[in-house]
Amino acid sequence: MSLLEDIVDLLKCVLEYFGVPPDMLVPVWESTHCGQYRSLVRMIGTNLPLSPYPRLRFQIPLQTFNKHSHIDVSVDSPAIPTLADVLWLVEDEGDSHTKFRNAVPLRKKCVPHGYETPSLGSVSVKAQRGGGVLAQSTQPDALLKISALEEELQRLRAQIATIITAPAGPVVSPTDPGTPCSAPKPAPVLTSTPVCPPPPPPPPPPAMPTRTEVSMSEMIQQRQAAKKETLAQCGPSLTTAPSMLEVLRDLNQVKLRSVERSPGGTPIRRRRSKGVACSSDPAALIAEALKRKFAHRQRDDSFGKENHSAEPSPFSSPDTPRIFQHTRRSQGRIHL
């Protein structure tokens, strides 16, 4: 306890030296004082003869540029910035000087002296806007290029279909000089006699995509009309359901259809005759030509599989060698 008493006496001496009454040593949580008496640090700080540090004070000017290019201090404007000023600063176009939200735009009105030099920010904003305009103008160009490529693809499909359906021979179909399929012209022969100018090129063939589009639309209309007719014919028959008595009555008279079978007993399947591809559809013509071209390869593969099955497998037992009777007799006579 002597140590605590010594500490209390030391604190009393220190407080008396600084001019603090010793009654202030009561704990803070027991005292009811407010303000400068709330803590020991506040009490020491208020009693010390120290000059307070000057506080920072922000001064917001109320000067704004009026329409008549003179400074008017009496303009009714808020002195404290708000959140609206933050949004206004974000939407700023980049000026070389500071202005307030309620000020008149200096670009439309007269600019005071000293603010005539543009900033780098304004130049960058203009460049960005110019880039956006260029990006918008390039979109229709890209659409035009895509449409041109689609037309060229349809033209190539039509040409491939005409080449496939044409009979084999030296006949060369006239092609469009603008297409990549056109063959290069031979070099002119140098002769001493004057050469007549070459004849004009033949006119290009009519565009195939238009005919294909018309034919496809006609086919779709015909199919829809045929579907409607079949539905109209089958409608009354579907509504009337057959009675079970009629079905059971004819059960004894059922006859099975005769099916042709091979010698092994398996039924013979006949190949279905496929109709001729539509001449107006280039994709169908190309598919039919490819099927004809690769049909012999499928036949060769199936024939090779059948022959391969007859060959001995590596896992089968080896064949026993056959020994004829005359060799046995000859060998027996030699040993005897």
Swiss-Prot record:
InterPro entries given in the database record: Mtfr1
Annotated region (Disordered), positions in chain: 296-336
A biological process term (GO) from this entry: aerobic respiration
Alphabetical UniProt keywords: Coiled coil, Mitochondrion
Start-end of Basic and acidic residues biased regions: 297-309
Any one GO cellular component localisation term in the record: mitochondrion
Main location: mitochondrion
One Pfam family of this chain: Mito_fiss_reg
Protein localization: Mitochondrion
Composition-biased stretches (Basic residues): 325-336
Keyword set includes Coiled coil: yes
Coiled coil: 139-166
Transmembrane segments: none
Entry's family note: Belongs to the MTFR1 family.
UniProt function note: May play a role in mitochondrial aerobic respiration. Can also promote mitochondrial fission.
Name this polypeptide is given: Mitochondrial fission regulator 2
Source organism (scientific name): Danio rerio (Zebrafish)
